From Swiss-Prot:
Transmembrane segments: none annotated. The keyword Lyase does not apply. This is DCC-interacting protein 13-beta. Expressed in insulin-target tissues including skeletal muscle, liver, fat, and brain. Highly expressed in kidney and pancreas. Abundantly expressed in the ventromedial hypothalamus (VMH), barely detectable in the arcuate nucleus (ARC) and paraventricular nucleus (PVN) of the hypothalamus. Also expressed in pancreatic beta-cells. Residues 1-428 are annotated as: Required for RAB5A binding. Residues 3-268 form the BAR domain.
Amino acid sequence: MPAVDKLLLEEALQDSPQARSLLSVFEEDAGTLTDYTNQLLQAMQRVYGAQNEMCLATQQLSRQLLAYEKQNFALGKGDEEVISTLHYFSKVMDELNGLHTELAKQLADTMVLPVIQFREKDLTEVSTLKDLFGLASSEHDLSMAKYSRLPKKKENEKAKTEIVKEVAAARRKQHLSSLQYYCALNALQYRKRAAMMEPLIGFAHGQINFFKRGAEMFSKSMDGFLSSVKDMVQSIQVELEAEADKMRVSQQELLSVSESVYTPDIDVATAQINRNLIQKTGYLNLRNKTGLVTTTWERLYFFTQGGNLMCQPRGAVAGGLIQDLDNCSVMAVDCEDRRYCFQISTPSGKPGIILQAESRKEYEEWICAVNNISRQIYLTDNPEAVAIKLNQTALQAVTPITSFGKKQESSCSSQNIKNSDIEDDNIVPKATASIPETEELIAPGTPIQFDIVLPATEFLDQNRGGRRTNPFGETEDGSFPEAEDSLLQQMFIVRFLGSMAVKTDSTAEVIYEAMRQVLAARAIHNIFRMTESHLMVTSQTLRLIDPQTQVSRACFELTSVTQFAAHQENKRLVGFVIRVPESTGEESLSTYIFESNSEGEKICYAINLGKEIIEVQKDPEALARLMLSVPLTNDGKYVLLNDQADDTGGSPSENRGAESEA
C-alpha cells in the first residue's frame, strides 16, 4: 500500500509557519473527509431504508395474495387455479421476506454501523482535538504577550518568575495538544481508507449471502412450478387473443347494420311489427304526477313476467311490480302533446299508468303484447296461436282517443267516469288471494289510494249539477259547528295508510283484509310517506284535521260508519268502512286504514260510544244513564281515559283549544 502523508511530531514544539501551513492542509483534508462521510452515510442509510421497505413490501404483498380468496367477486368462476397459485406465491413471498429481513439486518450491522462509528469516533475526535489545539495556542500567545511586556528597568523578580512559569505551562500545554492533534491527523489518513472499504465489504457479503440462499430456495421444484404457471398464463393469453378476434368480428358485424337500428321511426312503412307477442321488454317513459297539474316523465326499463308488468330502474338489482296485467285493458291516448302514448287500465275500467314508447313499432308492439297478456293467453298450451286470433283486437286498441270524454263514452261503468281524473295517484296491487272468501270481501285488482288529499274531487260534479260533497277536500270555513254541540269530543293522532273500495260491510274481516292489502302494497312499492292528521270523534262525525292549519281534510257522518275494527296483532292499526251514496242511486263501500299513536281499540271505543249516543238521544232516560256511566269534562263532554292528553302530546287545555279552532 502506498505511503501516506504525515505530520512530523518534532516540529510540533517549534510551531513554525511551515508546520502550521502543512497542518492546514491536513485540516482541509479532514474537513473534506467529514463532508464526504456524511454524504456516504446518507447513501448507505438510503440503501438500508430501501431494503427495510422491501421487507415491509414483500410482507404486505404476501398478505394481499392471500386476500384474493376472501374477495367477494361477482364473477368468480374458474378462480380455483388462481387461488392455489397465489397461495403458493404467498408462501414464497414469506420465505423471501425472511431473506430480505436478514439482509437488512446485515446491512445495518456491517455497512451502516461502521460508517457511523467512524464519523462519531474518529472524525469527532479530530474535531475536538482541533478545538483544544486552538485554545492552547491562544493561551500560549497571551502568555508570550505578557512576557514580552516585562520592563527592562526596575525588574520585579516575583512578577517575572510568575510570567515565566505561565509561559512554560502554556507552551507545555500547546506542545501536548499539538502532539495529540498531529497524531490524530496522521492516524486519520490510515483510518479513512479502512473506513471506506469496511462498509462495502459488509454490503457485498450481505448481498452474496442473500443471493446464495435465494438460489437454494428457488430449487428445481420451484423452476417446475414457475414453468407450469408460465404455461397456464400463455394458454390464457391464447384464449384471450382468440376471444378478442371473435369480439372484433362480432363488433364489425354489429356495426354494419343499417341506420334504422339507431334512429327511431326512420322508415315507418317498412317496420315489421310483431303482433303475436306474449312477452315484451324495453325502455318506456312513465308519466308521474308531481302536483295538482304538474307531471314528470321518467325513462325506465320495463318487462313483462307472466301476467305482471315489471319495472327495473337503471342500476337496480331486480325489478319491481308496476301493475297486474290480467284482465286489464290497454289503449292509445293523447297525452301532453307527446307521441306514442298508451294507457293501461284496471280490470274495472279505471285508468292506470300512462307510458310512452320511443317509436311507432315499439308503441304498437307494446299495445299488442299487453293486450295479449291481459287475456291470460300466456297460460294456454299454445299462446302464440291464441295471440294471432287476438290481433284484430290489438289493432283496434292502437287507434288513439282524442279526449277523456270519448274514453268515458266507451266505458260501461259509472265508476270509471267518477275516478278518471284521479287514478294517476293509484297503484293497483296484484290480487294474490285466491280463496273465495277474500274475493267476496274485496274485488281482485281493486285500486288503493295512498294519499288522503284528492284534489281532483274539488271540482263541481257535473252529473248532479251542484257542488259535490268532497270526502277528502278541505272545508271552505275553518269552524265545525257540530263539534260545539256534540256531547262527545275525542282527539287522536293518526297517520293515513290507504283506502280502497270493498264489496261488503257485514263483517270486520273486510277491514283486516284491507289492512293486509294496503300494507302489502306499501311494501311492494316502497311507499313510506304517510299523512299525519288529528282524528276528532264526535257524536255526529269523524273528522280528519290538519295539525298545522287546523283545516278539515275529511269529514264522515258517524251514521255512515258501518264497520270499524282494530288489528288483532298490531294494536295501533285501525280501520273503518264508510257507506257513501252515489249519483246513480246506489251506495258504495270504502274502507280507510290508519296507524294511531294510541291503541286502535280506544278509537273503536270512541266511535262505538258516539254511535250509542246517536241511538240513545231519542230516549232521554237512556241518554241520562249513559252520561252517568262515562266521566264528563267541565263543559259536559265525554272524556275517554285521558286519551286526549296522551295522544296529542299536549295539555288538555291546549287540545280543547285546538278543537275550538277547528
